[in-house]
């Protein structure tokens, strides 16, 4: 069986925008790199249920988000919503409210867009974060993530301030702060993912290479720390920046990518999700594994390397969580986002 995977990334060198590849699950092989949409710096991409593709984007007006109608093969441009400044770094769809959320790293902003009848977008709210952290990379707010909690609130991660902010979403797309969780100073809060039970979350720190295991109180929208665990081996002392974090749909295994150590860390998750145990590290066979994702059956993990321009394919043992390399040299330039269809 062949599955399609969408890829987003930078367009600084050779990439033209969004691409697709095919995964042959029987042959354990990636093939057929094809251009889907020409867009500048689509570093994060997402789809809604109607087949609209939303990407981070830049144009002559500045940075923001681009909308496309995607038929499974090609994408028709519906328009950009951009403002002065750098593009977004994360986009997510809220199907229930028909909204799209965006995180702007450089401006320290959270943006909300309303999906129009044809799939195009209209900006409805912008929230500016303020503050800083102790590290040189934290001179100001850097919102790196904006997506939904299991109970339908919006949660953001701010790498610059080490804060995780939970918002209530009001009306046609206005944000009101519900709670703020303050992670360890200098962590560099980048992304967060939730256990399938909706009561536990895992916050990854780009700057200190750790994961904080958090309880989540749905009634109040409040996080509390349960555990902190490293993403690196004890004997590694080189540079590293953690990037992506994913949990299997059965809640048994968690994975993170390490840029510098150039590995995936595999964790065993306790039955209630409250504790992580490190299983080991897998060399990703490339440089700067910015993103990775499961295929739709979670039998495979596809890893994208931003600097070495290759995808690696790993077979995943669902019983043990361990990874076996199947392919490491598939060319895909400047990729920073992997999205299975």
Swiss-Prot record:
Listed name of the protein: Uncharacterized protein YwcC
Domain of life: Bacteria
Family per similarity comment: Belongs to the cycloisomerase 2 family.
Organism: Lactococcus lactis subsp. lactis (strain IL1403)
Molecular function, one GO term: 6-phosphogluconolactonase activity
A Pfam family the protein falls into: Lactonase
InterPro entries assigned to the protein according to its UniProt record, in alphabetical order: Cycloisomerase_2, Haem_d1_sf, Lactonase_7-beta_prop, WD40/YVTN_repeat-like_dom_sf
CC annotations in GO: cytosol
Name of the gene this protein is made from: ywcC
């Amino acid at each position: 069986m062949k599955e399609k995977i969408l890829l987003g990334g930078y367009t600084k060198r050779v990439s033209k925008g969004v691409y697709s590849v095919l995964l042959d699950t029987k042959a354990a092989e990636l093939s057929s790199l094809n251009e889907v949409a020409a867009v500048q710096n689509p570093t994060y991409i997402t789809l809604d249920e109607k087949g609209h593709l939303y990407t981070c984007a830049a144009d002559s007006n500045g940075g923001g988000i681009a909308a496309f109608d995607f038929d499974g093969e090609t994408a028709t441009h519906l328009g950009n919503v951009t403002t002065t400044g750098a593009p977004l770094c994360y986009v997510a769809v809220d199907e229930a409210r028909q909204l799209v959320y965006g995180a702007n790293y450089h401006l320290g902003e959270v943006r909300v867009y309303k999906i129009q009848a044809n799939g195009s977008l209209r900006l409805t709210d912008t929230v500016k974060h303020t503050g800083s952290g102790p590290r040189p990379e934290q001179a100001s707010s850097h919102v790196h993530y904006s997506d939904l909690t299991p109970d339908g609130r919006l949660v953001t991660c701010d790498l610059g301030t080490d804060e995780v902010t939970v918002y209530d979403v009001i009306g046609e797309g206005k944000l009101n702060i519900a709670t703020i969780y303050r992670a360890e100073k200098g962590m560099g809060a980048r992304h967060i993912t939730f256990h399938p039970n909706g009561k536990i979350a895992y916050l990854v720190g780009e700057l200190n290479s750790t994961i904080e295991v958090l309880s989540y109180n749905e009634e109040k929208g409040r996080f509390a720390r349960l555990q902190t665990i490293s993403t690196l081996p004890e004997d590694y002392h080189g540079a590293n920046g953690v990037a992506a974090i994913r949990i299997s749909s059965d809640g048994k295994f968690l994975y993170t990518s390490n840029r510098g150590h150039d590995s995936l860390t595999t964790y065993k998750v306790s039955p209630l999700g409250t504790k992580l145990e490190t299983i080991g590290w897998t060399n990703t066979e490339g440089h700067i594994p910015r993103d990775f994702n499961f295929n739709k059956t979670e039998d495979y993990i596809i890893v994208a390397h931003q600097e070495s321009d290759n995808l690696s394919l790993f077979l995943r043992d669902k019983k043990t969580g361990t990874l076996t390399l199947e392919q490491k040299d598939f060319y895909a330039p400047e990729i920073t986002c992997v999205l299975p269809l």
